[in-house]
C-alpha cells in the first residue's frame, strides 16, 4: 500500500513502469516552498516608510497653528503612551493646518525605529477612519500624502493591524489615488496597497477584487522616477504571490506584458521583483506556464541567470525552474535559450541555495525525453551533479539524486551506461543510509533502473552475469539493500526485497548483524563497511 498525502507526492512523479508517468515532473512540495519563503531575505512582503534624517530636516515648517520639528519631537507625551490629547484634538479639528500638523506627528511616531506604536494609534478612537477621510481631500495633496504615509505604516504591521486599515475603507480610495496628479500621492498609495496585498492571500484577493490592476499597470506607461517603479513592481509581485490559494490567474495575467519589459530595466530591485512576480505566475499548471512563455520572457530570464547579483539570480532561477516543470515542449523552450551552460555555472555557485535550485531545475529537464537528457549529457553536467551527490549539503544532494534517477528512468541504454561510467552507483548507494525515506526510494529506483539494464545486457550477450551487481556490491550497496528489508516504510522494504530476490539471489541473511542508528548524522551505521558512509545533514 502506498502512503497517502504529500509524502508520496514526489515518488509518484517518477517515470517508471510501476509509477505514474504523468506526474514525473516534480513540483515543489508546499512545505519546502514555505520554508524557502520564510528564509528568503531578498524580497520583503511588507515595507515601512521611514523618513531619513535628511528628509526630516528638509521638511517645511508649518505655520498658522503648525509646529516646528523640534516642538513635534519634544511634545509632552501622554501618560503611559505617546499620543497626546493635543494631537487627537488637532486631528479632529476643522482647521486644515492643524489637521496636517497632527497627521505629520502621527506619521513621525509611526516612522520611529524599531517599534512604532501602531497599536496605540489604531486604538485611539476614530483616528484611522479620520486618516482615511483625509485621503479624499483632493484639494490638499499634502494632507493626502501624509495620511497615506500613516496608513502605509499601519498596514506594514501584523495582520490584525492591516485589517483595521481595510475595514476603514482605505483600499478603494488608495486605488483611486493611483490616478492622482501628484506623484508623491501616487507612490504612497502604491506602497500602502503593496503592504496590504502582501499581508495574506485573503488581503491580496480583496485588493485584486477592488480592480487595482488597470490603474497600477497604467503607472508603468509613464516616465516615473525610479522609486515609483520600484514600489509599483514590488506591489505587483505581492499581487501575484501566494499558493494557498493562488490568485485568480485571469486577474493577474494582464501584468505579463509589463513584466516582460521590466526585465530589461537596469535597476537590480526592479529586476528582482519582476523575476519574483514571474516565478509566482509560472508556479502552477501548464496553462499558466504557457502564458508566461507566450509573454516572451524566457530568453531574458535565462540571461539573468548570469546576473552579478544573487538578488536577481535567485528569482530568475526560480522562474526558469518552474517553467521546466511543464511538458517537454515547454521545457524545450528553455533549452533553446541556451540555459544549460548557465545552469552548469550555477552548479558551482558558492551559495548553496542557488546550487540546490539549479539541481532541482536540471532534475525536471532530465525528467523529459531522451533528446533532452542527451542535451544535459552534451552540456557535461552529470560530472558536476555526481560530485554534488557526493559532497554537497544534504538538501542539495537530494535534488542531484532526483536529476540522476530521472535520467536513469527515461534514458536510453547508452545514456544509463554513461552515468554508470561516471560513477553514479556509489553515491546512490550512499543515499540508502539516510533517514529521509523519500530519498531512499529515489536512490533505490535509480539503482533498480541500472540493474534492469544490466539484466538486459546479460541476456543479450548470453553471459547471464549482470555487470552492475558487482559494482553495487563493491559500493556496499547490497549490504544496505539487505538491511532495508527491515525498513519501517512498506514501499522501501518491499522494493529492497524485490531487488535482492530478483538481482542478487536468495542468500541467507545474518539477522544478528543489525546496523546501529546514528541519530546525530541521520544515517545507519554498518559495521561490516570499512569505508565511511556520508550521512545527511537535515
Curated annotation (Swiss-Prot):
Modified residues (Phosphoserine): 63
Region of interest (NLS binding site (minor)), ranges: 318-406
Gene Ontology cellular-component terms listed: cytosol; dendrite; glutamatergic synapse; NLS-dependent protein nuclear import complex; nucleoplasm; nucleus; postsynaptic density
Residues modified to N-acetylmethionine: 1
Induction: Injection of 6-hydroxydopamine into the ascending medial forebrain bundle causes the formation of lesions and leads to up-regulation of KPNA1 in the denervated striatum in a time-dependent manner, reaching a maximum two weeks post-lesion.
GO MF annotation terms: nuclear import signal receptor activity; nuclear localization sequence binding
IBB domain residues: 1-57
Binding to RAG1: annotated segments: 245-437
Summary of subunit composition and partner proteins: Heterodimer; with KPNB1. Interacts with APEX1 (via its N-terminus). Interacts with CTNNBL1 (via its N-terminal). Interacts with AICDA (via its NLS). Interacts with ANP32E and ZIC3. Interacts with SNAI1 (via zinc fingers). Interacts with NSMF; the interaction occurs in a calcium-independent manner after synaptic NMDA receptor stimulation and is required for nuclear import of NSMF but is competed by CABP1. Interacts with DCAF8. Interacts with ITSN1 isoform 2. Interacts with TALDO1.
Protein's name in the database: Importin subunit alpha-5
Organism annotation: Rattus norvegicus
Gene expressing this chain: Kpna1
